[in-house]
């Protein structure tokens, strides 16, 4: 087994390598003056089982192209099997046609990864579970729920805890965490009565006097979580925190969270901290390196990955 890292998240790659007690394969990744990407693998990988570690996070197009070129380099270097380890799968929100003459970009990206030569994909908390079906190669979608559960038990009293989905689409995800914590759930139902009218946050569930934890797969601008926290507090919640797998945190989302009424926002290291963002103690990071490392070990040894979640 060999591990190779792209440039999207080198700290996470090193943490995964440390977990597996395996070195990162020597490689050289360079961007030419015109923006083109060049990759050279500096070790023999012929006949090897190679795991290429690369999130397709910001800048999404650069990191996606880098992943494809790394896969192509491994194919041409005669690697026996290539697994694309993509902690954060970019373009996942474009998983369906949203209108006439629009693409399904998540499917296109899945096709590109397979066509480049990847034999399988390993990722974490896809925005929509059905994206697994977009790939024509084996795909393992890991869940960070147990990572979140362990942290919540360390930092929160669970007796009066309420797990809240910030939208109707995230109910299954919220219910899974609530089951682990033996907690109840509530739902924030966002509705816009008509064009030009502000969204109304309807709360489904009893939140008065409860300590609420919003649980979602992704935080981009932070607006949804901040607004949901305000709605919960106005309905009588004692406090509101948020746990999110992928902290994309664009458009100074950290500054928005810092000024919000959220107690804290907890994200994982699937995405690197955005450059030039407003630092805030309200944003805390957990690592998914042990989760990914164990899944990689199991894949390399032809063991069950699903048993991680039994």
From Swiss-Prot:
PROSITE patterns: PRPP_SYNTHASE. One of its GO terms (cellular component) is ribose phosphate diphosphokinase complex. It is found in: Cytoplasm. ATP binds at residues 34-36, 93-94. Its main location: cytoplasm. It holds the Pfam family Pribosyltran_N. GO terms for molecular function: ATP binding; kinase activity; magnesium ion binding; ribose phosphate diphosphokinase activity. Keywords: ATP-binding, Cytoplasm, Kinase, Magnesium, Metal-binding, Nucleotide biosynthesis, Nucleotide-binding, Transferase. Mg(2+) 1 binds at residue 127. The keyword Nucleotide-binding applies. The active site is at residue 190. Mg(2+) 2 binds at residue 167. NCBIfam families: PRK01259.1 (NF002320), ribP_PPkin (TIGR01251). Homohexamer. This is Ribose-phosphate pyrophosphokinase. It comes from Maricaulis maris (strain MCS10).
């Amino acid at each position: 087994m060999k591990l190779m890292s792209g440039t999207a998240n080198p700290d996470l790659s090193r943490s995964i390598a440390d977990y597996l007690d395996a070195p990162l394969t020597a490689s050289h990744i360079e961007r030419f003056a015109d923006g083109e990407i060049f990759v050279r693998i500096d070790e023999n990988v012929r006949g090897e089982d190679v795991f290429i570690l690369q999130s397709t996070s910001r800048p999404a197009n650069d990191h996606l192209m880098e992943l494809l070129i790394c896969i192509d380099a491994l194919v041409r270097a005669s690697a026996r099997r290539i697994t694309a380890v993509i902690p954060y799968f970019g373009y996942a929100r474009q998983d369906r046609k949203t209108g006439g003459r629009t693409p399904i970009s998540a499917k296109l990206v899945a096709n590109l990864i397979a066509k480049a030569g990847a034999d399988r994909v390993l990722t974490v908390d896809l925005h929509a579970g059905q994206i697994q079906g977009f790939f024509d190669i084996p795909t393992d979608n890991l869940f960070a729920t147990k990572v979140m559960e362990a942290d919540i038990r360390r930092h929160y009293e669970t007796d009066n805890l309420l797990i809240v989905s910030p939208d109707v689409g995230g109910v299954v995800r919220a219910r899974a965490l609530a089951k682990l914590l033996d907690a109840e759930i509530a739902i924030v139902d966002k509705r816009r009565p008509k064009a030009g009218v502000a969204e109304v946050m309807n709360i489904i569930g009893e939140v008065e006097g409860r300590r609420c934890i919003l649980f979602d797969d992704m935080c981009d601008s932070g607006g949804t979580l901040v607004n949901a926290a305000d709605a919960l507090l106005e309905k009588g919640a004692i406090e509101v925190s948020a746990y999110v797998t992928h902290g994309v945190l664009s458009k100074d989302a950290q500054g928005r969270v810092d000024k919000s009424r959220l107690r804290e926002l907890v994200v994982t290291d699937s995405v690197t901290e955005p450059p030039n963002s407003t630092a805030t103690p309200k944003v805390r990071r957990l690592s998914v390196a042990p989760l990914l490392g164990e899944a990689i070990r199991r894949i390399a040894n032809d063991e069950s990955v699903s048993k991680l979640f039994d």
